[in-house]
Amino acid sequence: MRKLNHALLAGALALACASCTAEKEANYQVIPLPQEVSLTQGNPFKLNENVLIAYPENNALLQRNAEFLSEYIQQATNYAPKTKAIAAGEQVKNAIVLGLDPGIANKEGYVLTTTPEGISINGQTENGVFYGIQTLRKSIPAEAKGATVLIPAGEIKDEPRFSYRGMHLDVGRHF
């Protein structure tokens, strides 16, 4: 009987330790769903206390976007990523890099690429980069305090479906 109690206690302790992992997984099942999500085989990017958010120097709007993302990551994980302006062509590791890409067709379109070395969010304009940040922000678990967030490797391409943003509320037909 004593051996059975010890075995049950050891099993419960092992199960409790296994459930207390310090890693949380991000999920790209966000609303609205991006137009194209392609996951790749490979290790995820680890969002932890050592991550840097980089943006092109002399771009105040992307600096503001970087600070916005840093504040959100701090709220969700208690890590405060530093933001840094980088020169054109400068490479940074373990970073979320914001940038502009005139090759993207839509002004509000973006491409979010995740590799084990980092994340890049490129848009044709600063607005496109902002919408890419929103997709990344929504994929991070809301409660990941002190945990390393594993962001799956892959690429997301998205742009607005319509040329306008808005809604129509017909109060006359609301019964």
What is the role of each PLM region?
Residues N122-G123, R165-F175:
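The substrate-binding groove and active-site-proximal loops of carbohydrate-active enzymes
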Residues C20-F162:
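Contiguous, structured surface segment used for ligand recognition
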Residues M1-Q29:
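Bacterial Sec-dependent N-terminal signal peptides
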